[in-house]
């Protein structure tokens, strides 16, 4: 029963994640946390694998159909590659940071409370920015070193929180690179792909992969790919303003789940 429920959550989250460019993990992680039936490290790993599968499909399809002449790819290599490189480095740092914070608490649930609290604050800030973004003057960074630093910050946060990416990716891309919604969504998935790849590789190399139900992982990964396929298709057809509305509604839901999780972990 729980495997079926997890698959439904992963598929739905991956569809929405592919549409909005937030990866899906920002939904999967807090929702699975709310059920409170798996260890935090297991949820982080399974969520990361699902997000990686979804972004892998999205990025590969984007590169295949994305010759600049076709106009279908919105990833600019000049900024996209250093962002991805920074995200890869950040993925390693975020993974290490999570284990460091976890080691500070005898009760692992307290580490979950820290994650939920940070995600709540980040999502609230993202919501405020999204609502008032028309009044905010944005930047247009193109320097490679700056792109690497921005990517590293995003990669660190996503790996530490176990969410793959999340709304913060889009806000950072809006502000620092003056991207529109759909361009930011595609570049966000590109960043998430590299961040999650290095995080998962690091887990394998350091032999820190937690014990988990293999069948559940297989189903979640398949749902991640299926959700990515459907979400990418829907994203092409939806107007940018509808993507914005979905994004705002999603952030409100995420904040409510985070509040519940903080109360649940600390209660």
Predicted regions and their residues:
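Juxtamembrane transmembrane-helix boundary motif
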Residues: 1-14, 33-42, 60-154, 205-267
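Alpha-helical transmembrane segments of helical membrane proteins, especially in multi-pass transport
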Residues: 195-202, 206
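Interfacial segments of multi-pass membrane proteins
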Residues: 28-42, 168-183
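Residue-level hotspots within the lipid-embedded alpha helices of multi-pass solute transporters
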Residues: 18, 155, 159-163, 196, ...
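Transmembrane helix-bundle signature of multi-pass membrane transporters/permeases
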Residues: 14, 44-52, 88, 185-196, ...
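Short helix-coil transition sites and intra-membrane helix breaks within transmembrane domains
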Residues: 15-25, 158-166, 183
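Central hydrophobic cores of alpha-helical transmembrane segments in multi-pass inner-membrane proteins
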Residues: 51-59
């Amino acid at each position: 029963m729980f495997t079926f429920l997890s698959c439904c959550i992963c598929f739905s989250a991956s569809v929405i994640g592919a549409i909005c460019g937030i990866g899906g993990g920002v939904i999967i992680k807090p929702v699975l946390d709310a059920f409170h039936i798996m260890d935090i490290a297991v949820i982080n790993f399974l969520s990361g694998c699902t997000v990686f599968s979804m972004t892998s499909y999205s990025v590969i399809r984007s590169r295949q159909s994305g010759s600049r002449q076709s106009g279908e790819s919105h990833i600019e290599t000049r900024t996209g590659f250093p962002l991805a490189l920074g995200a890869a480095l950040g993925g390693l740092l975020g993974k290490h940071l999570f284990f460091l914070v976890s080691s500070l608490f005898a009760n692992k649930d307290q580490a979950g409370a820290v994650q939920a609290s940070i995600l709540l604050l980040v999502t609230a800030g993202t919501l405020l920015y999204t609502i008032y973004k028309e009044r905010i003057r944005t930047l247009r960074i193109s320097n490679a070193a700056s792109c690497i630093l921005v990517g590293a910050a995003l990669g660190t946060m996503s790996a530490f929180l176990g969410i793959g990416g999340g709304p913060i990716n889009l806000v950072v891309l809006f502000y620092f690179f003056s991207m529109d919604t759909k361009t930011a969504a595609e570049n966000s998935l590109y960043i998430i792909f590299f961040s999650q790849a290095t995080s998962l590789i690091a887990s394998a190399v350091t032999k820190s992969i937690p014990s988990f139900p293999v069948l559940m992982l297989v189903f979640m990964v398949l749902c991640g790919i299926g959700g990515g396929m459907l979400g990418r298709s829907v994203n092409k057809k939806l107007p940018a303003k509808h993507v914005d509305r979905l994004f705002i509604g999603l952030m409100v839901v995420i904040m409510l789940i985070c509040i519940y999780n903080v109360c649940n972990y600390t209660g």
